[in-house]
From Swiss-Prot:
Superkingdom of the source species: Bacteria
GO molecular function, one term: proton-transporting ATP synthase activity, rotational mechanism
Keyword tags: ATP synthesis, CF(0), Hydrogen ion transport, Ion transport, Membrane, Thylakoid, Transmembrane, Transmembrane helix, Transport
Protein name per its UniProtKB record: ATP synthase subunit a
Gene that specifies this protein: atpB
Length: 252
């Protein structure tokens, strides 16, 4: 046991730091370089898996094609349950991209040994461990449901702000700000907390003790991806439904 612990402590682990970043400068713009590195890794992984799964499509799926078809069916059912039979098809790619990207980002924080890679400043971690990533994803959802509502209902979309009574106008406007805030901070907070707990346990009690926490973190990460995708589909569905008559007409 002692040789294993000595080997672990001898590894060049990055320091456990919060709020320190590896900055890249693009002109006068300063960006978090470590987020771009891990995001590109996740994107490359997803593109590679999609390419392999679709390279030789069989009528009877097997292997990775079977896995991807199961994921597609799951995302399609999720989107359909939140948007209804008539509207869901056009939004399956968007919701599916959100779910798969967040899912792989979250799991990369638990499964990829980012701490073994030292940077001049900061440390590598899951892309969703950075508030900039989660805010960007939440703003994409906000733009999507505004677009969906305006495309489906035209200017009637804005009647939702004064229904059932104009007194609720301030609350309806405030809701448009709280939706992206809740989406972004929920995802960011859960992933950051999970990675901090695992990092502290690895530093204090390496090897076997952190394993149950890591397994729990994988489960939590998957749930967070599901929650984000479900809420995104729900918000888009609500924007297209409107109130009362629109909802009934859409499902008649």
């Amino acid at each position: 046991m002692m040789p294993l612990i000595d080997l672990w402590t001898a590894l060049p682990l990055a320091k456990l730091e919060v709020g320190h970043h590896f900055y890249w400068y693009i002109g006068n713009l300063r960006v978090h370089g470590q987020v771009f590195i891990t995001t590109w890794f996740v994107m490359a992984l997803l593109i590679a898996v999609a390419f392999v799964a679709s390279r030789n499509i069989q009528r009877v799926p097997s292997g990775i094609q079977n896995l991807m078809e199961y994921a597609l069916e799951f995302i399609r059912d999720l989107t359909k349950s939140q948007m209804g039979e008539h509207e869901y098809r056009a939004w399956v790619p968007f919701v599916g991209t959100l779910f798969l990207f967040i899912f792989v980002c979250n799991w990369s924080g638990a499964l990829v040994p980012w701490k073994l890679i030292e940077l001049p400043e900061g440390e590598l971690a899951a892309p969703t461990n950075d508030i900039n990533t989660t805010v960007a994803l939440a703003l994409l959802v906000s733009l999507a449901y505004f677009y969906a509502g305006l495309r489906k209902r035209g200017l009637k979309y804005f009647t939702k702000y004064i229904e059932p009574t104009p007194v609720l106008l301030p609350i309806a406007i405030l809701e448009d700000f709280t939706k992206p805030l809740s989406l972004s901070f929920r995802l960011f907070g859960n992933i950051l907390a999970d990675e901090l707990v695992v990092s502290v346990l690895v530093l204090l009690v390496p090897l076997f003790v952190p394993l149950p926490v890591m397994v729990l973190g994988l489960f939590t990460s998957a749930i967070q991806a599901l929650v984000f995708a479900t809420l995104a589909a729900t918000y888009i569905g609500e924007a297209m439904e409107g109130h009362g008559g629109d909802h009934e007409a859409a499902h008649s």
